[in-house]
Amino acid sequence: GKTTLLRALIAAIPANERFGTLETDYELLVHLQPGRSNILALQARVGMGETQDGRRLGEYTVADLIPEALRQNLSRLVVGEVRGGEAGAMFEAMTAITGTMSTTHSHSAASTIDRLPSRVAQGGVLSIEEAYRQIAHHLHLLVHIQLIDNTWRGGRRDRIVSEVRQVTGGIESSRPVTHVVYRAEDGRTSYAPD
């Protein structure tokens, strides 16, 4: 669901606009789509062999790809899936390029506000407080995809947009302020502003 939504959002980017994707594994495959010749698709590389300074030989992470991407005069940057160390790379991209998108695992759009800073702090890139400030300043929307599994009663598995939160740019009690702009209730959709 997350990757499908991200692909749909990418499809809205004009074909002549230069943008890049950074992924641990090629999942978006935007660079293979017809009419997408003005794209920089970079993939991380898993190292092997013995480790040097805590890294495997030949390892090239998403964070390592950021400087190369920033040299390419991109209008947007898509960081595939943010699981751990990619969080710092995503934050670096957000501060350098005006249009960024990414996906991550979280229980709700609201819980993403706490998950991202803790992932960034684990990588030692920013403190949690600095990460909260970066979220408030650089993120605009948080979209949550939910799996609805009705196979137990003969139905099917559906993924729906269950919540959309706007990040206002403000901070209260050291956390970014968000407002619900959309929420699905019991599989039904509704506009539900805070």
Where do the language-model regions lie?
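Conserved P-loop NTPase
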Residues: 136-194
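Switch/coupling sub-region of P-loop NTPases
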Residues: 8-136
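Conserved lysine of the Walker
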Residues: 2
